[in-house]
Structures are given as structure tokens and as C-alpha cells.
Regions:
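Structural signal for hydrophobic packing residues in well-ordered secondary-structure cores
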Residues: 12, 27, 52-55, 142-150, ...
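Residue-level detector of conserved catalytic or cofactor/ligand-binding positions
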Residues: 263-271
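Acidic carboxylate-rich catalytic motifs and surrounding loops in phosphoryl-/glycosyl-chemistry enzymes
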Residues: 60-65, 154-161, 231-232
């Protein structure tokens, strides 16, 4: 099966030219009620304006008309990969972005710390955006409480604010599937979802995820704000063509958020 990336690989030639690509993730907004401007339209942006005056401008439809992509497919599309063919879950992006190596059969998942009220109702999906220090403290509690689940090794990593990463290791056993539903309901005022496997290979993963959620809530029961966890974006090790080989470009990245650390992205790519 071929796609545009195969054609680009055939046509690309190395040159001395340089490209600066600026990605403002999350800057989009809806018109304000006061004057109809978005936040970006209302802002004073002399530096962006000066950069735009020296740039080639355009618009891109990242996935399809009317589809708002998540960070994974959105960034893949920006860098020329078909996000419908090359699927990378948020868990893998988060894990690799902080330098965590994934092995065959492992599953990584992106976690949010959350605030749960009476009846396990989600009050805040980001637990008030705790400090990185508080994040590390909570991760330490979870590491002590959940080193493994029924013999399956569990690794927990701090990321930033409310974000953390969990890796379920296959440990030489049967590969864990990553095809299961999210725990994060993407809304407040409701309970967290129960993970449901969508295929046989993911049955064990769903059991591990649901057990982790229960144990995490027990470990955090004395916390007033960071007392729950929400999961989304399960991913095993993805593979896609090398950016260098496809475009004949040597890429470097400066990122303010660990998920996009280019230092580690080669681990997601095929030779």
C-alpha cells in the first residue's frame, strides 16, 4: 500500500535550504461574544506578524472536514504522515517524549490526575492543574502502592502538572493489546468510564487498567484534590517511516512540552 509519503520519498533530494516550522498547539479558539474575534485575532502579535511577513502561508485540513484532531494525529499530519494510516496513541507519544522505552507487547497510556467527588463523580478532569512537585509526590504514592498487578509489571512516570504516564509491561508473556475504551469520560459531572476491550488481545489490558484505577483511588483516598485517575490514548509500539529518509531533511525540535520531545522520536520510526 502506497501513499503520498512514498511519492515524497521518491522525489525528495537533499539541499542546503532550511525550514523553520512553528506549531502553536491549542491556539485556535471560537469567536468571543463581545466582538466576534477569537483570542488570537484579539491579541497583539507583532512577532508572529513579522514572522508571517517573511513566510509562506496556507491552511491545512489535518484529518478531514469538521474533525478536530487530538495531539497525536494532528502532529503526524503536520509532518506529512497520513494520520488514518499511521496511528500513534497518545500513550506512546507521552512515554517516548519523556524517554521511556517501549518493548514489544507493552502498552503505554496517558493519564490525567482528577478530582472525584461523592459517588466518584468527576469534578475536575485536571485536578486543579497541580504543580510538578505535587505531581511527583502523587506518582511516588502510586509507585509504592502499585508496583505490579497480578504479576504484570507496572511503571508510572511523572509528566507535567496533571499529566502522567503508565506503562504495562508484557514482561516476556503474551503481548498486551491496546484496543480498548478510555476511562476518561471527557466531561465533568459523571463517573469515570470502565475500560472495555474491543478485541481478545486487549481483554487482559482492560482488566489491568480497571484494577489500576481502583488501586489508585484507594491509595489517594486521603487526598482532597488529586484523588482519582483518568486514562486515554492506549498505545503499543508504533512504527512508521523515518522522517529523515522520507524528506531528506535532518530535523531538530525545540518543545515546551515533553510529549513532543524530538530527542526520542526515532524510537517510533522504522529504519
Amino acid at each position: 500500500m502506497s501513499d503520498l509519503l512514498d511519492t515524497i520519498r521518491d522525489l525528495a533530494k537533499p539541499t542546503d535550504s532550511k525550514i523553520l516550522m512553528v506549531v502553536l498547539d491549542g491556539v485556535g479558539g471560537l469567536p468571543l461574544e463581545t466582538n466576534g474575534d477569537t483570542e488570537l485575532a484579539a491579541a497583539k502579535t507583532p512577532n508572529l506578524d513579522a514572522l508571517a511577513a517573511q513566510s509562506q502561508l496556507g491552511q491545512v485540513e489535518l484529518v478531514g472536514a469538521g474533525i478536530t484532531p487530538g495531539s497525536g494525529p494532528g502532529h503526524l499530519s503536520l509532518f506529512g504522515y497520513d494520520p488514518l494510516r499511521y496511528v500513534v496513541g497518545r500513550g506512546a507519544l507521552s512515554a517516548v517524549g519523556i524517554g521511556v522505552k517501549l518493548g514489544a507487547g507493552d502498552v503505554a497510556v496517558r493519564g490525567n490526575f482528577a478530582t472525584l467527588g461523592e459517588g466518584r463523580i468527576v469534578q475536575d478532569r485536571r485536578a486543579g492543574r497541580p504543580s510538578d512537585e505535587k505531581n511527583a509526590e502523587i506518582v511516588g504514592k502510586l509507585k509504592a502502592a502499585i508496583p505490579d498487578i497480578d504479576g504484570t509489571p507496572v511503571e508510572i512516570y511523572t509528566e507535567s502538572e496533571h499529566r502522567f504516564v503508565v506503562v504495562f509491561r508484557a514482561g516476556g508473556g503474551s503481548p498486551l493489546g491496546a484496543n480498548l475504551s478510555d476511562v476518561d469520560p471527557q466531561a465533568t459531572g459523571v463517573q469515570p468510564m470502565t475500560a472495555q476491550a474491543h478485541d481478545d488481545a486487549s481483554q487482559k489490558t482492560a482488566q489491568l487498567v480497571n484494577a489500576f484505577v481502583q488501586r489508585a483511588e484507594a491509595a489517594l483516598k486521603d487526598e482532597t484534590q488529586v484523588n482519582g485517575v483518568l486514562f486515554r490514548g492506549y498505545s503499543d509500539v508504533p512504527h512508521f517511516p523515518s522522517f529523515d529518509a522520507a524528506y531528506q531533511l535532518k530535523a531538530a525540535c525545540i518543545a515546551s512540552y515533553p510529549m513532543r520531545s524530538e530527542e526520542h522520536t526515532s524510537e517510533l520510526q522504522s529504519p
